[in-house]
Amino acid sequence: MGRGTVWFLRAEAALYAGFLALDLAGTGGGWSLALKYSGIALCLLSALLRAGDREGRLVCAALALTLSADFFLLVLDAWYALGVALFCGVQGLYLARLRAMGAGLWLPLRLGLTAAALLAAVLLGLLTPLNALALVYFPELVCNAAAALSLGRRGRMFGLGLLLFVGCDVCVGLHNLAGLPVPLSAFAQVGMWLFYLPSQVLIVLSIPKE
């Protein structure tokens, strides 16, 4: 492991411990937000320093969109549809990376899951523009995680990162459910970033070494 990677992991660990401590103490606020956003920005910077081939450049582009999406969803706490649309773009770029790695398209599963999710939303009267975007995005993330893990050792780090990404988004969904039991809601509140920053760190580390 190179010196740059060691310092990257140390910095991310410090940011991670900082915002988790603030969130668990219930005193997060602006400081926690700043630490979280800095963690994602540092992931992009590290990816830019590591990128050398097409896979690396695709990850950099995806992390740039991730940072932009988090600006709307985390920093501004507004423009949610735009933020989710940017995350759809992130998954599109990760699909392109998976194809470059030799993974299959998994098109029937992607289309089937998306169609089923949208149909369920229609039947339940829950289909809004924001929900539609989320229901297109989430099946893509799940399929990308499965496709990466199916590649074996070569896709393991990337797949684990995407799997933690799934965990984050499950917590986001739970957090937005009305009437959730207080303990589960409290876990979901912390769990979003408990999973999210490590997912991005693993995705950065999955960039092939030159």
Task: Give the predicted meaning of each segment.
Residues 1-210:
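Polytopic alpha-helical membrane-helix bundles and their juxtamembrane interface segments
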